[in-house]
Amino acid sequence: DLLNSKSILSDPMKDANITGFYLAYHNQNDIKLSKKIAQVYLEKCPSLAFEAKKHTIPQKGFGKYRVGFLSHHFYDHTIGKLYRGFIEHLDRKLFEVILFRTSKRKDALAITIEENADQVVHLRTNLKSAQLAVSSKKLDLLFYPDIGMDSFTYFLAFSRLAPVQVTSWGHPNSTGIPNIDYFVSSRDLEVDTGDSHYSETLVRLKNPPTYYYRPEIPEGSKAPQDFGLPSDAHVYLCPQTLFKLHPNFDSILGKILENDPQGHLLLISGRYKSEENLLLDRFKKVFPKAINRVTFLP
């Protein structure tokens, strides 16, 4: 209906601000929907398809490759943790690393990531301004770790700002965006028919495209009884956002508890109590005898 209407989006950030983020969590091939969403935005807001032609021709010569990393989440966030080491350890004999940030958040991890880049550019959350700022760096490759998690970087990704534009599984779904060329994943994360799930060319690496540092363990580690569990409890922690737990996963959790009578499942509390109640209702249908061994942590 939107494609057939005569409506125009003068500013998709204000007029729509939808990225299709939640599609990744219903266990279906979303390629048609992702491409349709992108098509609607391009039809209704043609300026999204900005192309900096004079800066998107591969640079000739024998200098370093100029690689840009662009995300809202380069701070103490999952994305910051996944890509901190990746940015730090790229061979500087081959690559010049330019970091593009859309968040003003400054914490210890944000400072570390910035220190590991050769240049840092703080982008205004204005599409035209950001398009010009990124394209002016004459990149050889632009890497978006997490298209779809933040609406501004999602809409910016519609532009052609570098000869090669890449995303990865910071958000585990195809963008459907024509100007994103490659989706970098891992062999162990993709099914045999995975290519058909992406509008991008799927690249299967041997290992995930991250460099993850071991988390620092805080002092004063807690014992099971600190969480109201028996002292001999076997603790299974699943610290994932509750809406990401697909019903197909319920039986796996149930089997773990059924096969380990001392097992206790710890989950992170949701933003709303109703999320926990809905999840418990699901669990009761799948593993009712072990439901009393499920605990939500505040």
Please annotate each region the language model reported.
Residues 1, 294-298:
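Short, intrinsically disordered, charge-balanced linker/junction segments flanking boundaries
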Residues 74-77, 122-123, 240-245, 267-274, ...:
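Short, contiguous acidic/charged loop-to-helix segments that flank catalytic cores in large enzymes
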Residues 13-18, 232, 257-263:
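Short acidic (Asp/Glu) and glycine-rich catalytic loops that position anionic groups and cofactors
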Residues 1-229, 281-289:
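Alpha-helical solenoid repeat scaffolds of the TPR/TPR-like class and their adjacent stem/linker regions
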Residues 80-81, 110, 247-250, 276-277:
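Conserved strand-to-helix beginnings and helix N-cap segments that scaffold or border functional pockets
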Residues 65-72, 230-246, 250, 254:
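Conserved donor-binding/catalytic core segment of Leloir-type glycosyltransferases
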Residues 69-71, 98-101, 143-146, 237-240, ...:
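Short beta-strand segments
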Residues 94-96, 254-292:
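A conserved nucleotide-sugar
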